[in-house]
A protein has these predicted regions:
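Classical Sec-dependent N-terminal signal peptides that target proteins to the secretory pathway
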Residues: 1-12
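Gram-negative and organellar
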Residues: 12-37, 53-58, 63-66, 86-95, ...
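Amphipathic alpha-helical repeat scaffolds of TPR domains
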Residues: 44-51
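Short coil turns that delineate tetratricopeptide repeat
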Residues: 77-78, 112
């Protein structure tokens, strides 16, 4: 569930006012005000107006700045670099990062040793995902101003260097867990019996309970190309080990790699897909295809995510009737209600073509929920509905199958309580599937489980 929306949205709001401006305001007031407002004027009132404008920048009071800056610029002795700095800060406030970057660079051409402007430039480059350029600036600052800046500022710069260096290192996640299905049963309340070619089956309300162990491993590496462009390689595995015979042993191995574009508010990935599956220690199928993943940040509150995926599935001879194509698509949005609450929702669907039209289907669904962050834990809830329509009448089932599935997912994550560096979480899943092929495919299921997750 956590894959359906970007959890960094909450953290971004919590951190947005702790960036360079707050960390450096006191430092810049003392050391760099005189550099930006180099007193070269013969008229005292212009000097004073320049200092007033700089103080207003520190207070982020652009309404007042807009009222007086025209008078300042109209004077022939105004400080052109101060004006550029004002416009660059205003551009940052309006998310016009490329304009701000251009103005910061123009200032540094004339005044190359302005620490505050260098830091602001590095921050702006990070916003537009020019990670390598931002890293180079921070490393240059660390060398150039070694011994001449406060310990707090040194710590800030070192943290930024570590953050940017990690962008091009292997990153991933390991998840270990266990779950228990405590009322997996058939949903039909009747004692129906269905017979076909001398073989019969009947409905039962007897619950089937059982547990399973599961693991998930994924690792991803970014390979910088130029500017906003990069390559991406990802691989991992998912496994399920049943405690009883309720479910089969499963192993999925996947590899993908391709191209990624990122800027301040857009991310686009084009990724080939290789996926192999094993069931009960036997090879089950191979999927080859590709995926287009997009993410667009409309503003600091709204993010839209869209995916389109294609796979061609091939099976061993005994399962070759499942060979065919699968298309998967989704469109989701997240809304940041406040610094501790994110709401999300969207639509998703799939089309599956198999050798038999009676096994081929189209599926569509809707999902909505929220994530609440508290001092004790993070609480995630999602509800959804999906409908699956099969293409043709199934002579074996004596019906044209149509399934309707309703589900609830809830998870509590104790992010501040590590166990051997792993983050614990508990979850509950419940679903009811109602099918026109009632005897076989209607069921109810409830599951409770625990996960231990480590990110690296």
């Amino acid at each position: 569930l956590l894959l359906f929306f970007p959890l960094h949205s909450i953290q971004a709001v919590q951190d947005v006012n702790e960036e360079v401006t707050n960390d450096l305001s006191g430092y810049s007031n003392k050391k760099h005000q005189s550099e930006i407002n180099n007193v070269k004027y013969s008229k005292k009132n212009i000097d004073e107006l320049g200092f007033i404008l700089y103080d207003l920048i520190q207070q982020r009071d652009f309404d007042v700045i807009n009222k007086i800056i025209d008078n300042y610029v109209s004077h022939k002795d105004h400080d052109k670099e101060l004006v550029k700095y004002i416009y660059s800060e205003k551009a940052m406030l309006n998310n016009e990062y490329n304009l701000a970057i251009r103005l910061y660079n123009e200032i540094l051409i004339h005044k190359p040793n302005m620490l505050l402007v260098e830091l602001k430039l590095a921050r702006a480059l990070t916003y537009v995902k020019h990670y390598e350029a931002a890293l180079s600036i921070y490393q240059n600052i660390k060398t150039k101003y070694s011994g001449g800046i406060s310990s707090k500022l040194v710590e800030y710069i070192e943290n930024k260097i570590i953050y940017l260096e990690n962008k091009n290192r292997w990153q991933g996640m390991v998840k270990l867990g266990s779950s228990y299905d405590f009322n997996l049963n058939e949903a039909s309340n009747s004692r129906e019996m269905y017979c076909f070619r001398s073989k019969c089956m009947n409905s039962s309300n007897q619950s089937i309970a059982g547990g399973k162990w599961h693991y998930y491993i994924k690792s991803t590496k970014r390979f910088p190309l130029v500017g906003n462009h990069s390559g991406l390689l990802s691989f991992g595995a998912f496994g399920l080990e049943p405690m009883k015979t309720v479910t089969a042993r499963k192993i999925n191995i996947f590899i993908s790699g391709g191209y990624q574009f990122e800027n301040a508010n857009t991310k686009i990935g084009i990724l080939p897909i290789f996926e192999a599956k094993w069931h009960d220690n036997q090879y089950y199928n191979l999927s080859l295809g590709g995926k287009i993943a997009t993410e667009y940040t409309l503003n600091h509150r709204v993010t839209i995510l869209g995916d389109f995926e294609y796979k061609n599935k091939t099976h061993p001879h005994e399962y070759s009737f499942n060979d065919g194509d699968k298309w998967i698509y989704s469109l989701f949005g997240t809304y940041l209600v406040d610094s501790q609450l994110v709401a999300f929702g969207g639509i998703h669907g799939a089309n599956r073509e198999k050798q038999r039209n009676s096994d081929s289907y189209s599926q569509y669904g809707i999902r909505a929920g929220f994530l609440k962050v508290t001092g004790l834990c993070d609480f995630l809830v999602a509800v959804g509905y999906k409908q699956t329509n099969f293409e043709q009448f199934d002579v074996y089932l004596n019906v044209k199958r149509k399934d309707q599935n309703r589900y609830l997912n809830a998870q509590v994550t104790f992010d501040k309580n590590k166990i051997l560096t792993f983050t614990p979480s508990i979850y509950f899943n419940s679903q009811v599937n109602k099918s026109t092929a009632d005897i076989i495919y209607s069921f109810k299921q409830s599951e409770v489980g625990v996960n231990f997750t480590k990110k690296f």
